UniProtKB/Swiss-Prot annotation:
Residues 627-663 form a coiled coil. It comes from Homo sapiens. This is Zinc finger and BTB domain-containing protein 4. It comes from the Eukaryota. The modification Phosphothreonine is found at residues 795, 797, 983. PROSITE patterns: BTB, ZINC_FINGER_C2H2_1, ZINC_FINGER_C2H2_2. Changing residue 795 to A: Impaired HIPK2-mediated phosphorylation. One of its GO terms (molecular function) is sequence-specific DNA binding. Residues 67-124, 183-221, 257-281, 428-765, 783-852, 883-904, 972-1013 are annotated as: Disordered.
Amino acid sequence: MPPPAEVTDPSHAPAVLRQLNEQRLRGLFCDVTLIAGDTKFPAHRSVLAASSPFFREALLTSAPLPLPPATGGAAPNPATTTAASSSSSSSSSSSSSSSSASSSSSSSSSSPPPASPPASSPPRVLELPGVPAAAFSDVLNFIYSARLALPGGGGDGAAVAEIGALGRRLGISRLQGLGEGGDAWVPPTPAPMATSQPEEDSFGPGPRPAGEWEGDRAEAQAPDLQCSLPRRPLPCPQCGKSFIHPKRLQTHEAQCRRGASTRGSTGLGAGGAGPGGPAGVDASALPPPVGFRGGPEHVVKVVGGHVLYVCAACERSYVTLSSLKRHSNVHSWRRKYPCRYCEKVFALAEYRTKHEVWHTGERRYQCIFCWETFVTYYNLKTHQRAFHGISPGLLASEKTPNGGYKPKLNTLKLYRLLPMRAAKRPYKTYSQGAPEAPLSPTLNTPAPVAMPASPPPGPPPAPEPGPPPSVITFAHPAPSVIVHGGSSSGGGGSGTASTGGSQAASVITYTAPPRPPKKREYPPPPPEPAATPTSPATAVSPATAAGPAMATTTEEAKGRNPRAGRTLTYTAKPVGGIGGGGGPPTGAGRGPSQLQAPPPLCQITVRIGEEAIVKRRISETDLRPGELSGEEMEESEEDEEEEDEEEEEEDEEESKAGGEDQLWRPYYSYKPKRKAGAAGGASVGGSGLPRGRRPPRWRQKLERRSWEETPAAESPAGRARTERRHRCGDCAQTFTTLRKLRKHQEAHGGGSHSSRAGRRPSTRFTCPHCAKVCKTAAALSRHGQRHAAERPGGTPTPVIAYSKGSAGTRPGDVKEEAPQEMQVSSSSGEAGGGSTAAEEASETASLQDPIISGGEEPPVVASGGSYVYPPVQEFPLALIGGGREPGGGRGKSGSEGPVGAGEGDRMEGIGAAKVTFYPEPYPLVYGPQLLAAYPYNFSNLAALPVALNMVLPDEKGAGALPFLPGVFGYAVNPQAAPPAPPTPPPPTLPPPIPPKGEGERAGVERTQKGDVG
């Protein structure tokens, strides 16, 4: 009878192992998670159980009837080995190939696994206490790839000894002699054909000898592969080149296979090897990538006197070596930063932080101008461009001569990165539902031979229908649960979450303060009352509301990536609400008014380009809008009115909307936008935003909720308090908006200045006492009162002011006021000396008495020859012109009247005592720009500029008053009292020349006043 035909595939076992390794790297079909140190390693239970007796016993401890391990024979049974390895291999072409594939991974255990898999699933999370993550990463790579790159090319004795000790504890025979001076892992001498000869005997038909494990691994330990860079994410099995993206690795593998098929056609014996040979045979003879042969992992370059450290993998350059070492974690196998919400592990902490934001929904990027928070930096940049007219990219970089951009050295960030509120501590404690006896004694076993002799661990004292899950807990006050599988139970009495199922689940319990779910992603919280935590601003998560159904129905229905056979549950969205209050927050609004009380910004300093430096102190109460009462709001408005004009405009924007959350806005912006006050006024119900501009979300939310609360401004008292608050400093008239007040002030000044569209007028008012420049006359008036308060004992400079109904007032009884914007000259002495002053003023007019005659009523002559002054003139500047006697009466011509020093202009030759202000029939046009035009001392006799057209014509049709000359002067009375600042008596000016071309009316007026001839 002819022997049965047999078909063998020598490359099947390496191909299956390579596919399993690729699945592990991608996280596919992994049914167990190993925790070593602070790192999570996903793996396959079948591969671990077939490679290590420790993992086999640890994974079988939760079975209902664990079979005692056999005490082992010399050679394993191919039938049982095939049954045990069927779970780890994807498919087998024949029984012999399955036998060879399984025997290569389980012969070192010296005992076959049980013939049938356990009835129930073992725990999915297994922690290895005391096992370093770096050494376990190397051992796990060896289990899956049959290759081990020794750290430092084998020269790092401490790392090699650590790997050897871990191999002895796990029962991996090939790693037991590592680090003890054995010759099993001494790197062989470089020989070109050293790896092809073991291949001829490794894949021959028939049962394999007991020492075949060492032979199979020896062919993988070529000198070139041993010196390759360790811990590459996705290495090519042919040439050892590493890749980060799996698609690039697949493209590279296709090219390597075509090259390996031509090189691997020779060197194979007649023992059944295929023409192409196994996929991994000739790969060991290929040289690895240049730069990774046991040398340094970086290249040092000197560019322009600066030392740069270049990564050998991706050729990125770094200024410091520590930055390069930190970057090298990206290319390594070590993923030290596992995600706290899923099974992903990241090489850098910032990668994990950016990833976890999508789980928690935290808004960490805060705009420093409006305190709005955003999830990503890109949303923040878009917001600042649209609402503030600022491009952060232009501030962080500058143009280069070739048209590009380079980063600035002193870049100021226009945002604040808030700390993570969902941050968890690293793994701290571990508790398992089953007794920990199977883990601890087995892990400390000195040799794998003693394991079969040890009795199997007993089952739990009171086993449940399903095995209890393993729980990883964190020491935080309130929990949020991550559920994988059917049923779970939170640790520490924090609550339970059950989904109903027969299999046990592993629960990772994070006891951090929970966050309310996002409204558009999660259903609203259940109506049942929940216990309030200690912090009043912290809301209660559905997982902590003392109910198993609450945690499942609220969060499991909205898991991020639901997969078949499990549900992923977590809480998201950070807590909102600064203002406190124990009620649960609504998920609708997440404005700055609902942030969880971050540390207040004591001072913000922003440099926007080269334009300005803005400094603003923000107290704790500024971050809590809507908490001030009506009286406090009034007090704050009064304080704002006393500030300078620069801060006054800003405060008007803050307080114009009443109780609205109008936070601080910058003074400067690049775009000439229309101001909020100019667009909609400062009415209570107005939005105060430019047209076409969408209001921010916090303002929309307040407007939507305005119907619920009746504002205080709706009452008559509140309406009167908010409507009339802008007062004119000239006529004491009140206005509802600042815009109307400014238009009214322009009417005072004649409306001569017109501002450009979209910009403020360039009018400025300078204080004569200091260098202060104010924007309005009202602000300058308030500023002048401060100077008066600073000099209580000084001699105030009197300003001529009259009372309208004072017919019998003596000229000496003048009202003395504090100096305003300009010290207009005064002739009055102290009260009581009015007669002497009036007699001196009757002789001639001095510069200190610019009194002009004219009016509807004649000046009343009192006893002593003094005259009664006309009604009060509220303006600090006297307007000069020819006066008229009512009824055609003419006053006596005393001495020569005021004479002009201009272009031959001559004022009317009336007596100095008859020169007075214009009375009521002539409305005076007083403009703020007139003050800025008089920066001179009035005691000086130099020519003074005169504002033209300052007097309007009479409304009764009497003719216009004489046109004021461009320059004028006064006759000097040498007996007049000197002014407050004493100056030498000025000389007398010659009489002015009558103006030419003044017209017939001017001549008639001079004739009536006795100035002819």
